[in-house]
Amino acid sequence: MSNISWYRHCSVRLQLVTLALFLLLGSASLGSAHIDEEFEDDVTTTISSIASPMRRTYTNEWAVRIAGGKVEEANRLANKYGYTNLGPIIPGDEYYLFRDDRKKSRSSRKTRSLSANQLQHEEDVMWMEQQVAKRRVKRGYRRIRRHTDDNDIFEEDDDGTQISKSRNRKHPDPNDPLWTDMWYLNRGEHHSDSTTRMDHNVKEAWDLGYTGKGVVVTILDDGLERTHPDISPNYDERASYDVNDRDNDPMPRYEFSDENRHGTRCAGEVAAIFNNSLCIVGIAYNANIGGIRMLDGDVTDAVEAASVGHNADYIDIYSASWGPDDDGRTVDGPAKLTRSAFEKGITMGRKGKGSIFVWASGNGGKDADSCNCDGYTNSIYTLSISSATENGNIPWYSEACSSTLATTYSSGATGEKMILTTDLHHACTNMHTGTSASAPLAAGIVALALEANPNLTWRDLQHIVIRTAKPINLRAGDWTTNGVGRNVSHSFGYGLMDAGAMVKLAKIWKKVDEQHRCRQFYPSRYKNIPNGNRLQLQLYSDGCYGGADENKVSYVEHVQAIVTLKAPKRGDLQIYLTSPSGTKSTLLTKRARDTSRSGFTDWAFMTTHNWGEQAAGLWILEIDNDGWDDAELVKWELVLYGTDRETGDFGGQHASPLAVRSVQMEATSSGTQYSIFHVITLVILTFSQILY
């Protein structure tokens, strides 16, 4: 090693020594800075939204924020400048949607008009933005051939098997003709050992009396065939809306290819009627089911916001089986209006308990995509669900990422079974596929838990999912045990969702403490990442114990690394985050198809793998550059979400070890002696690394 390299090597280690000495003196942690409230903005903390640059399609609609949200003022301004006021994007909010009928409905160029410029400068206009049509993809993958007969409607699989809606087959408990084929709900029925069963254990939840009654679920998709006889008794018009055509009827648009079948398929998985001699049984077969038609048209920020924010005080669970393109090169997420709708749903939905957003993790496996590049599944607000095949394998379409929370069954390779559900034209199908099929199964299971305990918050439910998910029988090479003894995988999250276990825990669950957020910045910027090399940055966190009470985090839930970096080819980068407990999360994998030179701008990579671990200690960010040229890390910050006190096995909180340690240090000398010992140990370890 050269002298220069040796000194540089020592310099990095000496920074840790300096850190230790500052800790001894009781100063704030070196290598981090507590953010003050004055730095708060609506750019990126919880939901990432910076998209890859691409050719944009501009619509003739504008989102306009009117001070006070007064409809009279919105109408006045729209009339004054020649717009049509289409009404509030979310009722009761300040954002309105204006349309300019003088312009083309779609254009590749952004409108630069005098009227738009003048409207923007009106005193009561706080913000306005021309709406862009986004590419959003349904997360099923397989096309099928359809046939009709004089009396029956059925679908044909590749091997020619037909599934009819006729009532000519009877099955006990229930008598729905396809119940015996619903392997993901009933094949573990005769296995008393819950650790070996390979289904979602819904029968146990049903036997306990939980069927989703009183819980409202809505499907955000391409429509809902509300007249389907296996759905209509549970259809709820208050949980439904047509955002595309701006009316109250979510019926899909019928066409020859039946492309708009997706929402109806998802809805049947949740709430198809029990024991009516038709098709299938929904997991939450007594739940109210609604549909938001929003994918059959231009999907803009306003469309997404109106969908995820629809009737948030009434709807309990929103299920979404779509997202940005799973092509291995897209980086995209919700924009300003949708971020606001998510945050409002979490804070105010369900009368303050928080809306439940269930999201399909994505089908980009064949293109080596990462669901951490999807700002919807990568959000702390969504319950991101992956898929497993009937044999417990990773499906070929599955995306691995650290934001996935849990798994449900879906389709797999040729010869492996798929998901059965309702279909258009009052039909049934055995060919629902991909993570599209996984998210509604999860939504149905969550509905059972909500019936067992309607007072659960959105975070309570995530805690319950993590504590009850089963890793047994799911095959992945990356299963690891985190710092609190829970098994977790990038492909399966914490494992297979277990309906029986969830309702039993939900019944006795005590509400967790309010969520705290600790933001800490890496102190220096513009770190070079040479090609073929790894950049490693160490950031010590004290859980923000030197700041305001609402920022103190002792036990983590979600963790984010918010990263801004430049790269000649974004897909050549890999990013890892290691916690003080030693749990290593893969935040970003190589994506060969991602040739973008845009890098990342304030992109919030999220991991759930540290759930329950202690926040305080050394966090390590590593960035591998396998490209042909240097990359550069501009900045990064660590965001820890969690609580000041430990969450118990049945909810509720225990005292924080950091708080106890703080009291001991103030009251006795033993606490100080412990800190001195801790610092001396750190110094010795540091110098040993230098000498090595």
UniProtKB/Swiss-Prot annotation:
The keyword Chloroplast is assigned to this record: no
Keyword Metal-binding: yes
GO CC term (a single one): trans-Golgi network
Protein name: Furin-like protease kpc-1
Gene this protein is translated from: kpc-1
Consequence the record notes for mutating P440S: In xr58; partial trapping of secondary dendrite branches next to primary dendrite branches. Forms tertiary and quaternary branches but with substantial overlap between tertiary dendrite branches
Span of the annotated motif Cell attachment site: 570-572
Gene3D superfamilies, A to Z: Galactose-binding domain-like (2.60.120.260), Peptidase S8, pro-domain (3.30.70.850), Peptidase S8/S53 domain (3.40.50.200)
E.C. code: 3.4.21.-
PANTHER family in UniProt: FURIN-LIKE PROTEASE 1, ISOFORMS 1_1-X_2 (PTHR42884:SF3), PROPROTEIN CONVERTASE SUBTILISIN/KEXIN-RELATED (PTHR42884)
Signal peptide: 1-33
Binding site for Ca(2+) 3: D326, D369, E399
Transmembrane segments: 671-692
Peptidase S8 domain location: 182-503
Effect of R136A: In wy1060; loss of propeptide cleavage, trapped secondary dendrite branches and loss of tertiary and quaternary dendrite branches
Cofactor note text: Binds 3 calcium ions per subunit.
Region (Disordered): 152-177, 230-249
Binding site for Ca(2+) 2: D242, D247, D249
Lumenal face residues: 140-670
